[in-house]
């Protein structure tokens, strides 16, 4: 059964994920002219660079949509963002600075909620603006068919007729003008930007070249902290979690997760917190480069992980990190709602996040420069008296206890010496005086 349609489905309802930009505007009008019945669906993801959401459906109707709907996805996006923080679902980092998978989270919400809205309108063909070289074409494919097994996919950008007639932005702009809409292309930037409430992605064009970097980017969620003329004052901020959920910032309870993210974005954005420059592997295994913003996600993640390390033991933390790396990859691949992802996510939410209650106070400076000033939690297993360098009463263990513990290590040390000697005999190790390893003589 054919799932991907390569020609305009004449006379049929076609849902299009409509942003109001040139690409989707031209595609909608073009499909209308070719005989399709376009239905426009716009996701309100709290994009920081979108000024008027209500205007977008009006544009779609003007361009020929049979119906245009604005779907508020912000609560769902906030919920998935918190789940990602609870599970540490982030697998891409450079030098300890994390990419918070904000675009994959947005696609998970958009792909499911827009297709669900289409089902309500008996629309079973879906198109969007993703290209064949990127990740989104596969993410939307997976989430769309997961939500509606009867869904067909039609993307104008995979239709050779569309490409021949409207192959570039100049052609699209001329087409819209010819159709009587006077559409003018926005000023060309040196890169493209995609955003939602959780973060922004800047990529392509000049940013495809590694000798262009963060200095050509104009942040939309924070300040250009690398510019010396931009004043950034140090600021103290506290974040409170209750059973793994962020509930207050600076002592003020914020019940609505959307409002909490917006406040975290405002605070983190004043410092440029959460900006990163990453080289990553796309789903198709080719490398790409992106510059990312995520001020609120970064602030919440820092506070959450501080509590995790103060509350849980080493083995739990290790498993949390290993599972988080795996879950991050699944999220990136468009598998956030697959059973293996749900298993990893709910494990972290149940056995890690549930114990994370407390408040972390930080000082934010420029960019990702910060200090942790205080950590408070009723569940802390950090007890300074256990390892105090001062003399304490009722110490949990004595020098004699440590002597016994060290003596037990002799068993492991003997085995280790024997194995190193075996490796040396096989030529795998050099045990001469010029190496850091001592000269070992097996069981001698």
UniProtKB/Swiss-Prot annotation:
This is Argininosuccinate synthase. GO terms for molecular function: argininosuccinate synthase activity; ATP binding; protein homodimerization activity. Pathway: Amino-acid biosynthesis; L-arginine biosynthesis; L-arginine from L-ornithine and carbamoyl phosphate: step 2/3. InterPro entries: Arg_succ_synth_type2_subfam, Arginosuc_syn_C, Arginosuc_syn_N, Arginosuc_synth, Arginosuc_synth_CS, Arginosuc_synth_type_1_subfam, AS_cat/multimer_dom_body, AS_multimer_C_tail. L-citrulline binds at residues 99, 135, 139, 192, 201, 203, 280. Homotetramer. It catalyses: L-citrulline + L-aspartate + ATP = 2-(N(omega)-L-arginino)succinate + AMP + diphosphate + H(+). The keyword Ligase applies. The gene is argG. Belongs to the argininosuccinate synthase family. Type 2 subfamily. GO terms for biological process: argininosuccinate metabolic process; L-arginine biosynthetic process; urea cycle. L-aspartate binds at residues 131, 135-136. CDD domains: ASS (cd01999). GO terms for cellular component: cytoplasm.
């Amino acid at each position: 059964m054919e799932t991907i349609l390569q020609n305009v489905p004449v006379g049929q309802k076609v849902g299009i994920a409509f942003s109001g930009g040139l690409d989707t505007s031209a595609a909608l009008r073009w499909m209308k002219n070719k005989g399709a019945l376009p239905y426009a669906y716009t996701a309100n993801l709290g994009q920081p660079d979108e000024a008027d959401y209500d205007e977008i459906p009006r544009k779609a109707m003007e361009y020929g949509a049979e119906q245009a709907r604005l779907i508020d996805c912000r609560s769902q996006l906030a919920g998935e963002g918190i789940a990602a923080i609870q599970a540490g679902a982030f697998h891409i980092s450079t030098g300890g600075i994390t990419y918070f998978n904000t675009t994959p989270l947005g696609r998970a919400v958009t792909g499911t909620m827009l297709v669900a809205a289409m089902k309500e309108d008996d629309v079973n063909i879906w198109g969007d603006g993703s290209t064949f070289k990127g990740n989104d074409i596969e993410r939307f494919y997976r989430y769309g068919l997961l939500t509606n097994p009867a869904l067909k996919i039609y993307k104008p950008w995979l239709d050779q007729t569309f490409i021949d007639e409207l192959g570039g932005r100049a052609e699209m702009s001329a087409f819209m003008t010819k159709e009587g809409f006077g559409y003018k292309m926005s000023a060309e930037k040196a890169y493209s930007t995609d955003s939602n409430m959780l973060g922004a992605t800047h990529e392509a064009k000049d940013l495809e070249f590694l000798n262009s970097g963060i200095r050509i980017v104009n942040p939309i969620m924070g300040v250009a902290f690398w510019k010396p003329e931009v004043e950034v004052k140090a600021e103290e901020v506290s974040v409170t979690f209750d059973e793994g959920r962020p509930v207050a910032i600076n002592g003020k309870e914020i019940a609505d997760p959307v409002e909490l993210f917006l406040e975290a974005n405002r605070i983190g954005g004043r410092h440029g917190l959460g900006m990163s420059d990453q080289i990553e592997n796309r789903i198709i295994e080719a490398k790409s480069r992106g510059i990312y913003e995520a001020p609120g996600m970064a602030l919440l993640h820092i506070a959450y992980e501080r509590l995790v390390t103060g509350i849980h033991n080493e083995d739990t933390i290790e498993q949390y990190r290993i599972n988080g790396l795996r879950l991050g990859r699944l999220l990136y691949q468009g598998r956030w709602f697959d059973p293996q992802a749900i298993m990893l996510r709910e494990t972290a939410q149940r056995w890690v996040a549930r114990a994370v209650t407390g408040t972390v106070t930080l000082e934010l400076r420029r960019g990702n420069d910060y200090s942790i000033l205080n950590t408070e939690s009723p569940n802390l297993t950090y007890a300074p008296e256990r390892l105090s360098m001062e003399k304490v009463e009722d110490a949990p263990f004595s020098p004699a206890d440590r002597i016994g513990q060290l003596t037990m290590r002799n068993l492991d040390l003997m085995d280790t010496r024997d194995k190193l000697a075996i490796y040396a005999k096989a030529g795998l190790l050099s045990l001469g005086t010029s190496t850091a390893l001592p000269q070992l003589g097996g069981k001698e």
